[in-house]
Amino acid sequence: MARLRLEDFGPELLSPCNLGADTGETVTLTGPSGSGKTLLLRALADLDPHRGVAWLNDRPATDFAAPDWRRRVCYLPAESHWWSDRVRDHFPHVDDATLSALGLPGEIPDWAVSRLSSGERQRLAVARLLSVQPEVLLLDEPTANLDPANTERVERVVADYRDRNAATVLWVSHDADQRERLGHRHWLIRDGRVEETA
């Protein structure tokens, strides 16, 4: 049985879908701009209204308190949000090994957020998500603005986390090469429908 299973599931603007993603899998999600990729991720994280049921390990989302579901099924938006100007304030705990693997300096937790480049913010957002230890990672173009070296770092860190924690990853990407590198399977949003493709 799939770790994450969607049963007649979808946000208002998409047709209901019946799809699943297994433990240890990365599913890549693509579709034209404005097709509903972000809407689907936000609905899966129970941040936006939707119909149908999302299941995690054979338990419906309704079995979980909303904060518990959102910790287990964790959404990383394309634009990260920072509510305090000190990096450390955004982490339940700082994992130096993850920061290093992402190519970030060890002293970065003590930096002001306002000092960070856009690429540093993007990689820190990945580290912050992993520090929550989710079971399902919903990643909305997490490498969109990164150079090839840092893109490779993020891909490797996420894959290592997935493999170590038997996690499931849903990764939005417009990069066909990246989808081929990462995806065990592929979902496509087209004409308001989410479907699995070869």
Model-derived regions: residue spans:
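Catalytic Walker B motif of ABC-type/P-loop ATPase nucleotide-binding domains
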Residues: 137-141
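Conserved ABC transporter NBD signature motif
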Residues: 49-61, 69
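Conserved ABC ATPase signature
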Residues: 112-116, 120
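Hydrophobic anchor residue at the start of the ABC signature
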Residues: 126
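Q-loop/switch helix immediately C-terminal to the Walker
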Residues: 72, 79-98
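Helix-to-loop junction immediately C-terminal to a conserved catalytic motif
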Residues: 44-45
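Helix N-cap at the start of a conserved alpha-helix in ABC-type nucleotide-binding domains
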Residues: 148-150
